[in-house]
Structure formats: structure tokens, C-alpha cells
A protein has these predicted regions:
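C-terminal accessory helical subdomains adjacent to catalytic cores in phosphodiester-
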Residues: 1-10, 19-40, 49-167
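Helix N-cap/beta->alpha junction signal
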Residues: 14-15
């Protein structure tokens, strides 16, 4: 459980595979894991996007300006469509909430990413944490299954790097 009055990141994973990526991310020694709370799996990308519009989530973001929410989904080879749906849903939220909501995910599924990288999901998450600040060229984030995340990832890292990563 995080302190809602200090900077923190909530993560809403679509499924168990995405949760395992997050768990690997949190095991990286450069990550201040106490600033992160992983929520229960939403059970599908539709449920993840619906959750971002729930009154409890929106009010939590508006009332707690140090809260950030990362939505982690499978894009299932439909990145453009899902990003557009996310943008449409985001547009109707209060600006105070919009600026602290982020959407990332694998182009297909985490399992396909695992196969393409030849690594366990937790190991991929660990490597992604290592590659976050300052996003070096040739990092795992530039993999074809992840490169579509670049604009949102840059926005996320800019916002959370000061409190999420060891200096």
C-alpha cells in the first residue's frame, strides 16, 4: 500500500502476464518499489479502459495530485485502435486526471514478447526498468513489440522518474 499523500504510481495490469512484467520491473534495484502499488488484474483491456473512467479512480486522481496511474494492456496488434479509444476516453476526464494517466503495453501480448526476446516475463520487466531512465538507444523499449510506447513512455518517465528511480 502506498501513501496517497506522497508521490506514487498505481499500476492496473490487464492480466497475469502483464502483472508478471510489473513484478520484474519492481525487482530492479533502481526502482523504489514502495512508491508503486500493483492493483488486481482487470481481466481484459476493455476492463482496464473502463476502470480509468470509474468515479473512484477519477476522484482519486483529482483529489490526490501526487497519484499517477499506469494502465498496462495487450494491444493485440491493434495499437492504433486501442490508443484512439484510450484518447477518446481520456478526453472526457478532468484535466487534473488526464495528466497523470498513462497507457503502455506490448504490441501483441506479453507472451509473444517473451518468445521474441527469449526471456522470462519477470526478466523482461527487470530489463525494462534498467532501460527506463534515460531511455538509451538500442534498449529493450525499442523492440518491435514495444516501440509503439515511445511517446507515452517519454511522458511517463518525465513525470515519475524523480520519485520512482534511485538517483
Amino acid at each position: 500500500m502506498t501513501n496517497k499523500y506522497t508521490d506514487h504510481l498505481l499500476v492496473l495490469p490487464e492480466d497475469d502476464a502483464n502483472r508478471r512484467l510489473v513484478n520484474g520491473f519492481l525487482k530492479n534495484v533502481d526502482v523504489k518499489y514502495r512508491c508503486v502499488q500493483v492493483l488486481h488484474e482487470a481481466g481484459g483491456w476493455h476492463n482496464v479502459l473502463a476502470a480509468m473512467q470509474a468515479a473512484e479512480v477519477v476522484n482519486g486522481l483529482v483529489n490526490h495530485p501526487k497519484r499517477h496511474l499506469l494502465l498496462l494492456i495487450d494491444f493485440d496488434q491493434q495499437a492504433a485502435t486501442r490508443l484512439q479509444e484510450y484518447a477518446n476516453r481520456l478526453a472526457v476526464l478532468p484535466v487534473a486526471a488526464q495528466n497523470r494517466l498513462y497507457l503502455l503495453g506490448s504490441l501483441e501480448t506479453p507472451e509473444r514478447l517473451r518468445t521474441a526476446c527469449g526471456m522470462h516475463l519477470e526478466d523482461i520487466g527487470h530489463q525494462l526498468a534498467s532501460d527506463c531512465p534515460p531511455l538509451p538507444a538500442g534498449s529493450l523499449w525499442s523492440h518491435p513489440h514495444l516501440q509503439h510506447n515511445a511517446p507515452e513512455l517519454a511522458r511517463l518517465v518525465t513525470q515519475v522518474q524523480p520519485f520512482l528511480f534511485q538517483v
